[in-house]
Amino acid sequence: MTGINLITSAPEVNSWAEAVEQDSAPHIQEGADGIRTETAFTEVDGVRYKVVTQFKVINKRVPKVVADRKKWVKFGSCKGEPAGPQVATTYVAEEVEMQFTRNRAGEQILDVQEDKQAAKTTSREHCRHCKGNDHWSTHCPYKVMYQLDEEADANQDADSKNALGLRGDGRQMERNRSDENTCRVTNLPQEMNEDELRDVFGRIGRVIRIFIARDKITGLPKGFAFVTFESRDDAARAIAELNDIRMYHMVLKVEWTRPSN
């Protein structure tokens, strides 16, 4: 009986260089779940290291334009880089949240947010300048404007008192009557002129006089104005109907003017 010895022969190695190349060549094994394990050997500074890498190849169907875009040649800092984003050159600096409020639904959302913000303000805060309840008088953005207006009122009061002895009480009575029919408008947008203000308040009643306080140097509105009606009833209706209405990017505040005496 003749015995046959089955010997699995290894690849023929003709030189030591081929032996080193075969030994250092990566060996790839694929598991049942599609994960491939690659084992390779590398030598650094005379020290031999074993490197094991696991990866999985996934085939994904994408639109043709996306596939063509991946073939574009990279340029600039990404020149010569392989396909796909690179950590060194591709990153998101910061996320920018945008809110579009051009349609009616967006305006309603903005109004609801403003109402919630107004509800959060405490009733203890009150500004004696603009009568607002969301800040103190020291933090009023129109504090300088009101102070200038108060100084102008004080100067006018002094002039009127000095003139009483010469002109009698007729001018003073006329001025008091005018103050009774005058509304003070604050939070006035700089884009609003006298004609627009007259058009808005003229729907309530007959307007006799409109005065918009302006800066002496720049000529820009200071943010408040005075509207005088022919009757006090029209002034009262203007305060009731036009107070807290939206005008451009501001909310108008309409109230009785402070008496000058």
From Swiss-Prot:
Superkingdom to which the source organism belongs: Eukaryota
A GO term, aspect molecular function: translation initiation factor activity
Cross-referenced InterPro entries: eIF3_g, eIF3g_N, eIF3G_RRM, Nucleotide-bd_a/b_plait_sf, RBD_domain_sf, RRM_dom
Keyword Cytoplasm: yes
Main subcellular localisation: cytoplasm
Region (Disordered): 156-180
Swiss-Prot/TrEMBL keywords: Cytoplasm, Initiation factor, Protein biosynthesis, RNA-binding
Domain RRM: 181-259
UniProt-listed Pfam families: eIF3g, RRM_1
GO cellular component, one term: eukaryotic 48S preinitiation complex
Listed GO biological process terms: formation of cytoplasmic translation initiation complex
Family: Belongs to the eIF-3 subunit G family.
Role this protein plays: RNA-binding component of the eukaryotic translation initiation factor 3 (eIF-3) complex, which is involved in protein synthesis of a specialized repertoire of mRNAs and, together with other initiation factors, stimulates binding of mRNA and methionyl-tRNAi to the 40S ribosome. The eIF-3 complex specifically targets and initiates translation of a subset of mRNAs involved in cell proliferation. This subunit can bind 18S rRNA.
Record PANTHER family: EUKARYOTIC TRANSLATION INITIATION FACTOR 3 SUBUNIT G
Record's subunit section: Component of the eukaryotic translation initiation factor 3 (eIF-3) complex.
HAMAP family (alphabetical): eIF3g
Protein name: Eukaryotic translation initiation factor 3 subunit G
Provenance organism: Caenorhabditis briggsae
Gene coding for it: eif-3.G.1
